[in-house]
Amino acid sequence: MEGECIKEELYTFFGRTTDAPSKSAFYKQLQKLKDGALRCLLLAFNRRLSKNLFNGKYQLLACDGSALDIFRNPDDKDTFYEPNAKSPKGYNQAYINACYSILDRRFTDLVIQKGRKRNEYSAFCQMVDTADIGHLAMVIYMADRGFASYNNFAHVIENGQYFLIRSSDKRVEGILGRSLQGVKSLDLHVERILTRSQSKKKREHPELAEYYRHISSRVPMDYLSDEKREYRISLRVVRVEISPGCFENLITNLPDHEFDMDDFKELYHLRWNEENAFRDIKYPLCLKALHSKKYEYVEQEIWARVILHNFCAEIAINTEVEKRQRKYEYQVNYSQAVKICRDFLRIHGQKSTMDVEGLIASNIEAVRPGRTFQRQKRFKIPMSFCYRN
């Protein structure tokens, strides 16, 4: 669907006839969908697609979240935010946590939470534990500073996978036990023993006092319990200069014989592709123009847009762009590719076919690498149901 009202969307697909389904019939069909049905469809679709691997070995999965403004409902306390200077009437939000395959340009899983109940830590652990990956597959989970926690590290390690997560100076200093003041480059392996007890007498390895880190009872750590009072974890702490005078801390468990500083810089920049994917599902795929008020239906729309995104991305990636002597390298215009793929999916009955790849290849745009822009934080109210054709 696009940004029109439901009735117009139905006319667009079925034709402007008296036989077109009604709005009530459409919503009755939505009610028949079982919880988890669209997730199963996403996973089944992804299994049929080939994977692009980093260094021919690792699948790169970026994990991040994005807020989505939904229909205003002050009675839903789990999604409603009180009025403020930017929103005098208040607003409601859902929160989309997603795993995104960077090299394949497709979403692999979602955890959708109500705005006020959002918890990126638990969502990350859930996606890692339920990841639909092959038995011998190797995955690198990449995430921003908000995901740096011992519990997240442990979940990836216990699932036999790898992670590369940005971290603040304060958190890294807590792990290392020393200041980063004046440190411009760092690549250090550390062993840490996590425990909820602050008593030195209860330690199983008192001779390794500098290895111990206390985990508060208020902080989730799923691998500590009354039976298992200590958890040992091995980390690699890296500090790289991304641009002149700009340093980033990365915490990982990647082997040093395969990944050096240049590899980490490359991976760091690749992670931002997920931000583009969130933009694509909100604007070219019209997720900002929701068609539902009920939260359950909003979730269905999110899953549906993500499945459509993966379908469009797979076709766009495999469309060859003619090579010419130009100032810039060119790539497929994804916004146009979405419109073309959507028109293709509407073909049914006796309608003629269309040259999807040819149309996509004729709509291209220049690739301008290295450009950066400051993020503009501004509130945008969701598109009202009253202002659609």
Label for each model-derived stretch:
Residues 59-61:
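Conserved beta-strand elements of the Class I
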Residues 44:
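Solvent-exposed, charged/polar functional surfaces in cytosolic regulatory/catalytic domains
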Residues 47:
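Glycine/small-residue-rich loop that forms an oxyanion/phosphate-binding "nest" at active or ligand-binding sites
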Residues 81-85:
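Conserved mixed alpha/beta core segments that line enzyme active sites in large multi-domain catalysts
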